[in-house]
């Protein structure tokens, strides 16, 4: 049990830090301004904190399966925040005479339905997990569903409030020169339709063959390293008492 708790805590820390660094790098690549890294990350941070508090109040326990919900929440919330922030900056450029409050209102109106549809489709995917017969998987489905709705609410409440405090001189969209990579890929897709469809069809066939060869791993003991106490204990039970 002690090993199990250690693994869960380790996963939360490792994946949390990894996702945080990835998010910072992504935001810097997109916005190139420190303030536009701080604002979306603050929104993500509060979403996760609120969700953890809700789980605590509901008495839901984090398991090996659901231990990565924080990393998933950060990624999904960040996607919403980037859409909102980018749209706000685009509207700022298109309507320079409007004040910040008007731009925020316009942004939320334009982005509400697109982001809502995105959230609902993702929620449906996670809700499919509740039809499993394994309780930790069912709980994970409910956790992510609740987490997505929490992130959605934060994106349309806290994020606009934070944007309202951004200094005016930092409200501008970074202009990029035409990318050689995207131009090259565009030419390939326009001039090689038949080849692309042929390769895609071949890959689909290979994927179907691979799917037919998938096997389910039902040995819980193999989830852990051989030098851990939990592995040694379960191996002893497997060999001496007929299985875990």
Question: Language-model features: where?
Answer:
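Membrane-embedded transmembrane helical bundles of large multi-pass transporters/channels
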Residues: 1-219, 223
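Solvent-exposed, non-transmembrane loop/terminal regulatory segments of multi-pass membrane proteins
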Residues: 186, 213-244
């Amino acid at each position: 049990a002690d090993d199990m708790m250690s693994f869960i805590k380790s996963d939360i820390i490792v994946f949390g830090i990894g996702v945080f660094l990835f998010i910072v790098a992504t935001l810097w690549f997109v916005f190139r301004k420190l303030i536009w890294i701080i604002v979306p990350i603050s929104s993500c941070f509060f979403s996760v904190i609120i969700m953890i508090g809700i789980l605590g109040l509901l008495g839901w326990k984090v398991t090996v399966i659901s231990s990565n919900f924080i990393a998933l929440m950060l990624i999904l919330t960040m996607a919403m925040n980037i859409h909102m922030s980018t749209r706000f900056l685009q509207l700022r450029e298109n309507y320079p005479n409007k004040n910040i409050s008007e731009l925020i209102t316009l942004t939320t109106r334009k982005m509400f339905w697109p982001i809502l549809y995105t959230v609902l489709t993702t929620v449906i995917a996670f809700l499919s997990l509740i039809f499993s017969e394994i309780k930790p998987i069912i709980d994970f489905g409910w956790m992510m569903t609740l987490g997505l709705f929490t992130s959605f609410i934060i994106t349309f409440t806290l994020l606009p409030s934070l944007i309202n405090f951004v200094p005016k001189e930092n409200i501008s969209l970074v202009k990029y020169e035409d990318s050689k990579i995207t131009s090259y890929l565009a030419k390939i897709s326009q001039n090689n339709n038949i080849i692309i469809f042929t390769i895609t069809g071949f890959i689909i066939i290979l994927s179907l063959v691979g799917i037919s060869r998938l096997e389910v791993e039902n040995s819980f003991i193999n989830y852990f390293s051989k030098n851990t106490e939990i592995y040694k204990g379960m191996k002893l039970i497997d060999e001496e008492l007929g299985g875990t």
